[in-house]
């Protein structure tokens, strides 16, 4: 049985970095959850053992299920039926395995149904999933949209939506439009407030990854007459309420298991997140900063898969009576690939640890005033 965690010793090297002790102790608030949840760690060693065991489960699922389904998923892909996305059979099996293993909402607090993982081991899981199937990582990795709900939504919204994500419901970030790709301040999806104070949105979004998800974060124009980013707000759309249909799925060159959708909104009911006008300049910026780590993990995971494929081929392919890996030119290519892979992974986890420190202190600051040395560490 393949295990994409245990067969890659470099992952454990990064998991046991000395900085993790500080991160874990802060994240666990000196292990205050130990008396409240039977699966909460008692101390640092217990926490690290928990991360290690969960990553072993991720590695096993990736090696035995997700990687085995990857070719079929990429060949068949999802389809649209009656305005809804139907995942490929392999994708359904992948999601089912992750749900049963409790691998959704990994970084969310235990009180909301999550595992309370720091960002670093969560990104490590994303690295492993990406090696198995980068397309599935696009779906599974969107669970980190819950971070935005946790950071900026009301307590009522947190309690309403985050437990659903932790239970296995999927998410998407509905940002781009036909005339607003990289230039998000040009977004024109219209958000209208009704007399009773509720909101509805109307318009079209395009290139939305996993666009038929259960819970959407939607960027829309809430301020009549505005034309720039200061007129945009963020909303939550719940698929259960209806009002959004999938017009089509884009025919991409790769990662076809991930449905990239065009969405049509017709009086779709939504909930405002945080404050009006802050959708792009604050909430989306925070959302995309987290997404960048996920995409970096996806790139590293893909690089790992490519390197292993190249190495296996070089050992198997024979010319002039010997394996081509024995030719200095080929060996040099492989050595350079490995060096770049190791450097990329090192940079990824160094960044993840700093993000952990920033986010944890940001969360602590909601509970109490940070000490001067803590503010310095956060920076």
Locate each region found by the language model.
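A short core secondary-structure module
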Residues: 198, 202-244
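Conserved short loop/turn motifs at secondary-structure junctions
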Residues: 76-86, 109-115, 143-152, 175-180, ...
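Extended amphipathic alpha-helical segments enriched in small hydrophobics
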Residues: 292-373
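A glycine-rich, basic-preceded beta-loop-alpha segment at the flavin cofactor/substrate interface
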Residues: 36-39, 240-243, 247, 259-291, ...
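Flexible, glycine/threonine-enriched loop-and-boundary segments that flank and lead into catalytic domains
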Residues: 81-108, 172-196, 200, 206-215, ...
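Short Gly/Pro-enriched turn/cap motifs at secondary-structure boundaries
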Residues: 179-182, 207-209, 226, 252-259
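Internal maturation/activation junctions in enzymes
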Residues: 141-142, 153-189, 352, 360-375
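Amphipathic, small/basic residue-rich leader segments at the start of a protein or domain
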Residues: 1-136, 156, 160, 360-377
